[in-house]
């Protein structure tokens, strides 16, 4: 049985979340709290397996409560947000910076066409997060200096440096991407294209949050633009993203793949066709297998590929599947990915890689 603490200042919303969570036979809401201070007390008294956390609360808000919990009694925290306004979403992602593992929108109300899907998603994420051993796994990345070239590793021969980096992430991806992008040097010489599975409405706020710590400009990708060196392009809500022969970004309403639009597989397939061995591609933490087969395709085309290791992943789904398929040239802990990317795009014929 998964024991959950629900932290929400609105009594109506609190009862709604309790109703959804208790509808699953594997979940029990063992305690509730109306603000951050009550949450700290309930945590000490009940020791839940997972906490769902509101952001805007009296006395102690969700960001402050998350930080205190992660410093004193680390517990998997899922942020449940009632707003997709970019300014407020930025605050929501501050809770990720403080140690929360996932962000979800508040499920749609009973009778709404999206109620069942959003309620099911919340239950699914709570179950997944209950299996995560929280050890403040990204704390050591924060405040780190930009990635250096001193990472020791095997030598790989390349006839030319990479021309593009593509990355896919899902559950646990936001803090992983923040850790990587904040550690890349300011003059990173190639563009970076990213697909991050995220609930519709959160991407703009997520990009704003990344901009606060990244040394590189971060954008939501736009139709027809040519990716610039040292810029980061995030696939937008509800669009598939690919590149065409000149390297320009193309956004489509093609069908979802692996239940996702944007899909990592969709982007990776296009990059394999257009860039082939001139690409560096990787899969980070996340559930499912989106991008795993296509990472193997990229490797077969001569691209350098990587997968995040199990120890530093929140959920070792996509990356784990890629490793099982033999799709990853390298398996890397999160804290070494930025240095490896920096080395891979360096302008030299032989590139040392992080391991």
From Swiss-Prot:
The active site is at 170, 197, 290. Its EC number is 3.1.1.61, 3.5.1.44. GO terms for biological process: chemotaxis. Residues 3-121 form the Response regulatory domain. The modification 4-aspartylphosphate is found at residue 54. Phosphorylated by CheA. Phosphorylation of the N-terminal regulatory domain activates the methylesterase activity. Keywords: Chemotaxis, Cytoplasm, Hydrolase, Phosphoprotein. Pfam families: CheB_methylest, Response_reg. It is found in: Cytoplasm. Contains a C-terminal catalytic domain, and an N-terminal region which modulates catalytic activity. It comes from Nitrosospira multiformis (strain ATCC 25196 / NCIMB 11849 / C 71). Involved in chemotaxis. Part of a chemotaxis signal transduction system that modulates chemotaxis in response to various stimuli. Catalyzes the demethylation of specific methylglutamate residues introduced into the chemoreceptors (methyl-accepting chemotaxis proteins or MCP) by CheR. Also mediates the irreversible deamidation of specific glutamine residues to glutamic acid. HAMAP family: CheB_chemtxs. It is an enzyme of class 3 (hydrolase). Belongs to the CheB family. This is Protein-glutamate methylesterase/protein-glutamine glutaminase. SMART domains: REC. It catalyses: [protein]-L-glutamate 5-O-methyl ester + H2O = L-glutamyl-[protein] + methanol + H(+); L-glutaminyl-[protein] + H2O = L-glutamyl-[protein] + NH4(+). CDD domains: CheB_Rec (cd16432), REC_CheB-like (cd17541). GO terms for molecular function: phosphorelay response regulator activity; protein-glutamate methylesterase activity; protein-glutamine glutaminase activity.
């Amino acid at each position: 049985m998964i024991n959950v603490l629900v932290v929400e200042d609105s009594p109506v919303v609190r009862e709604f979340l309790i109703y959804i969570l208790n509808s699953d036979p594997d979940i029990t809401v063992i305690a509730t709290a109306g603000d951050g201070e009550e949450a700290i007390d309930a945590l000490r008294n009940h020791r839940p397996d997972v906490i769902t956390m509101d952001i805007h609360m009296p006395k102690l808000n969700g960001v402050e409560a998350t930080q205190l919990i992660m410093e004193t009694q680390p517990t998997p925290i899922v942020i449940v947000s009632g707003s997709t306004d970019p300014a407020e979403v930025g605050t929501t992602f501050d809770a990720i910076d403080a140690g929360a593992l996932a962000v979800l929108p508040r499920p749609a109300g009973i009778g709404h066409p999206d109620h069942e899907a959003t309620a099911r998603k919340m239950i699914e994420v709570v179950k997944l997060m209950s299996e995560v051993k929280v050890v403040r796994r990204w704390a050591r990345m924060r405040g780190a200096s930009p990635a250096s070239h001193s990472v020791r590793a095997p030598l790989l021969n390349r006839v030319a440096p990479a021309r593009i980096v593509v990355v896919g992430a899902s559950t646990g991806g936001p803090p992983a991407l923040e850790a990587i992008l904040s550690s890349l040097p300011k003059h990173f010489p190639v563009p970076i294209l990213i697909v991050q599975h995220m609930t519709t409405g959160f991407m703009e706020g997520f990009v704003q949050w990344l901009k606060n710590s990244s040394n590189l400009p971060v954008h939501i990708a736009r139709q027809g633009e040519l990716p610039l060196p040292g810029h980061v392009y995030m696939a937008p809500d509800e669009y598939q993203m690919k590149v065409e022969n000149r390297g320009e970004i193309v956004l489509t309403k093609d069908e979802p793949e692996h239940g996702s639009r944007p899909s990592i597989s969709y982007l990776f397939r296009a990059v394999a066709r257009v860039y082939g061995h001139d690409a560096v591609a990787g899969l980070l933490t996340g559930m499912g297998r989106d991008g795993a087969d296509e990472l193997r395709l990229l490797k077969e085309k001569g691209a350098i590929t990587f997968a995040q290791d199990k120890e530093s992943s929140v959920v070792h789904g996509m990356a784990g599947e890629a490793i099982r398929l033999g799709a990853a040239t390298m398996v890397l802990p999160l804290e070494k990915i930025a240095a490896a990317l920096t080395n891979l795009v360096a302008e030299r014929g032989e590139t040392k890689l992080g391991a």
